[in-house]
UniProtKB/Swiss-Prot annotation:
Protein name per Swiss-Prot or TrEMBL: Protein PB1-F2
HAMAP family to which the protein is assigned, alphabetical: INFV_PB1F2
Any one GO cellular component localisation term in the record: host cell mitochondrial inner membrane
Main localisation: host cell
Self-association state and partner proteins as the record states: Oligomer. Interacts with human SLC25A6/ANT3 and VDAC1. Interacts with host MAVS.
Gene: PB1
Species of provenance: Influenza A virus (strain A/Chicken/Scotland/1959 H5N1)
């Protein structure tokens, strides 16, 4: 029987089926995730990536030293903090 390779995808989804051999020993085989599990994993992964990109761009913009943007920067920082708190509660 062909053995599946242990890829980052199969490691991260961790879908394991346990089978019994004729001699009573148990073997573990990585199973294929269904469509719902795949979509759930995809959405969790992309949400984490999007949040990281959004955080990086906000931090980069907030680090600018332009005096004209100081009031905007203050308002944006307050909005970002409230957004972060809101994201943690959801």
């Amino acid at each position: 029987m062909e053995q599946e390779q242990d890829t980052p995808w199969t490691q991260s989804t961790e879908h394991i089926n346990i089978q019994k051999k004729g001699n009573g020993q148990q073997t573990q085989k990585l199973g294929r995730p269904n469509l719902t599990q795949l979509m759930d994993h995809y959405l969790r992964t992309t949400n984490q990536v999007d949040m990281h990109k959004q955080t990086a761009s906000w931090k980069q913009w907030l680090s600018l030293k332009n005096p004209i943007q100081e009031s905007l920067k203050t308002r944006a920082l307050k909005r970002w903090k409230s957004f972060s708190k809101q994201g943690l509660t959801n």
